[in-house]
Amino acid sequence: MSHQLLSISPVDGRYNKVTSVLSDYFSEYALIRYRVRVEVEYFIALCELPLPQLAGVPKSAYEELRKLYTEFTIEDAQHVKEIESVTNHDVKAVEYLLKEKLEALGLNEYREFVHFGLTSQDINNTATPLLLEEALADVYLPALHELLDKIYSLAEQWEDVPMLAHTHGQPASPTRLGKEFKVFVERLERQIDLLQEIEPMAKFGGATGGFNAHHVAYPEIDWVEFGNNFVDSLGLVRAQYTTQIEHYDNLAATFDALKRINTILTDLARDMWTYISMEYFRQQVKKGEVGS
């Protein structure tokens, strides 16, 4: 039974009203959908080469194939979980689901090319950076820019409002309220720029990163070029030399950038709390709300 009151974390319990938009990116359902997306696009890319055995897949089938992730349902995700209860392997369960779907689309003779030559981390290490990159672009950065615009607007509005600055909790020298707000504008702008400079890296190269199975099966194909082009088509950057897994360095860099932005926002909140305690500002009262 699904209910917010049964959540084990306040993130998707008490605070669900503000975090629910992220479920399209970070829920297990979303992860499964992104895995399906990568598998489908990979299958289509193999058809586009084409691999000899896939030359018979009509281009008209691509739209229906893409509907497997654009119209992916909760019921589809639940079926993946049912398959996983037997396989005890989450990515293999996605592969089996897609084979069922291909059979339903009349493409049963091509089903064994789903996940051809790949290891699970080829899917995980593309689906994960992809969902994170799209969550940042669709949700996080628009919200952050909205906040930044508000802070900048207040800084402009209060540009010439004088106030007494403090250091070490004691009165120091005069300043302007607008200038104090522009401190946060500058800090946020710099960190947003740094965040957006981080490339979303993906790993895609088979069991140990060298496309070994691919080369054995089709030595005439430049699989490194294929992998680079495929990952680029997803809006990601392929790591050229890997083991079975992605390096995760850029993923760590992204989270570190988010941490720095959160630190700035914490500083902003603490300054506002201080200004309220000094009666420079007063909290807005909402009818019906109680407490501090």
PLM features: residue spans?
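Glycine-rich anion/phosphate-binding loop at the beta-strand->alpha-helix junction
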Residues: Q191, Q244-S292
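Intrinsically disordered or highly flexible coil/loop and linker segments, enriched in small
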Residues: E48-A55, L107-N108, L141, Q157-D160, ...
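A short, charged helix-loop
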Residues: N228-I245
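Short, small-residue-rich loop/turn micro-motifs
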Residues: A155, E159, L234, K287
